Amino acid sequence: MALQFQLNQTTPQTVTTDCVIVGIYADKTLSPTAKTLDAASGGRITALTARGDLTGKSGTSALLHDLNGVTAPRVLVVGLGEADKFGPGQYIKAVGDAVRALKDAPVTHALLTLSELPVKDRNAAWNIHQAVIAADHAAYRYTATLGTSRKKAAESGLITLAIHGQESSGLTLGQAIAEGVEYARALGNLPPNICTPVYLAETTAHFAATHPGATCEILDESKMEALGMGALLAVARGSANRPRLIVLKWNGGGDARPYVLVGKGITFDTGGVNLKTQGGIEEMKYDMCGGAAVIGTFVAAVKVRLPLNLIVIVPAVENAIDGNAYRPSDVITSMSGKTIEVGNTDAEGRLILCDALTYAERFKPEALIDVATLTGACMIALGRAATGLMTHHDDLANELLTAGEHVHDRAWRLPLWDEYQNLLDSTFADVYNIGGRWGGAITAGCFLSRFTEGQRWAHLDIAGSASNEGKRGMATGRPVGLLTQWLVDRC
């Protein structure tokens, strides 16, 4: 099911549409439009509520047909949950529930009126842009590698979702973020035999080539060797799929210093010589979701034509194993000149990132953010709801946390105290690539901090938030929303 969006200010009871979407709270209070339709239909919605057909519980919905006095042949009533707890998360869930409820209905046009609902500390533009993002997220279906019949069925159905309201800025931003999130999800969900480093580079270059103002440079292995990217290339040694460094640029801010985003692009992670085991390795196609997220953020920024300069860097590498693969106890030299003792080949993300972060210095960033599915330790600490945030800069932390709260793509700050740094000490090199059993997310952040000295830098660990686990799990597209909102706030 695909969606296209528009704004609509027509009176709901007379609008020409296949379905009007309204809400009801758990205490049986109707949304404003539900009240209007109830009055037009002679109290039909109230009667169904009294009979127990409409409970208002979050996650429930009921499709009503042919209400007297209402032009639309269908009215979808969505449960909103408890009114006093109705915040951004509940609003986003309600919109998603509405779209999922229409998946199998014979509907090609629907009017969503949930945008009229009051959401604490949010305005009308927020309601509209979050409605677009939530609806698009709920409508997403993976189809890239399905057989013809299943693909046709999954892609069938185009619904025009008219959102009740007039805040066009909210619609524009919402569509841009939704497109960026979907782009990131599409890349993240591809199997690793298709989404190789070269494929990722070529796909990204095609996007830049077809969007005026965007440019893309691809560095191959020889160029990375000339730059001295010994850490990145060490990880790449064991794979037949050769690495690429993707550099995207958007010049919307004249001569201003750019904001630089770096995303981990491990297209598949076997763990290398420290081979992963069953129960985790099968989800390692998602190890490039950091790269997918910063590319998705770039897509959103280009679509909304943000008036700033943005550079996105993705080290795209496969961590595989053959006779040439790097080993535990190897000492490698990074682009910065720092030497690194390899304690574990499955701690490869920080190795490709450290060279990419060093490369980013040449652009003199206004701020430098890296995004990575870096540590299982972060997932253990925060689960899948929150992205881990680490930085030495309180102002930057507050900017990112505020942006995440605003779009409900939230992060939680973890410390980068000096007490953790000595866990990375090495007898044989300048730094060890692992920090031991405890505080693994933090010591990974500490490792990266050694390659960002003098930079206004933050690290986002999305190991938990980048995907949903299990057989039906998928890439989430996070934190495209957080990053795009952060960039919007800088304009």
Curated annotation (Swiss-Prot):
It catalyses: Release of an N-terminal amino acid, Xaa-|-Yaa-, in which Xaa is preferably Leu, but may be other amino acids including Pro although not Arg or Lys, and Yaa may be Pro. Amino acid amides and methyl esters are also readily hydrolyzed, but rates on arylamides are exceedingly low; Release of an N-terminal amino acid, preferentially leucine, but not glutamic or aspartic acids. Its EC number is 3.4.11.1, 3.4.11.10. SUPFAM superfamilies: Macro domain-like (SSF52949), Zn-dependent exopeptidases (SSF53187). Its main location: cytoplasm. InterPro entries: Leucine_aapep/pepB, Macro_dom-like, Peptidase_M17_C, Peptidase_M17_leu_NH2_pept, Peptidase_M17_N. PROSITE patterns: CYTOSOL_AP. One of its GO terms (molecular function) is metalloaminopeptidase activity. Binds 2 manganese ions per subunit. GO terms for cellular component: cytoplasm. One of its GO terms (biological process) is proteolysis. Keywords: Aminopeptidase, Cytoplasm, Hydrolase, Manganese, Metal-binding, Protease. The keyword Hydrolase applies. The active site is at K276, R350. Mn(2+) 1 binds at D269, D346, E348. It is found in: Cytoplasm. Mn(2+) 2 binds at K264, D269, D287, E348. Its cofactor is Mn(2+). Presumably involved in the processing and regular turnover of intracellular proteins. Catalyzes the removal of unsubstituted N-terminal amino acids from various peptides. Belongs to the peptidase M17 family. This is Probable cytosol aminopeptidase. It comes from Xylella fastidiosa (strain 9a5c).
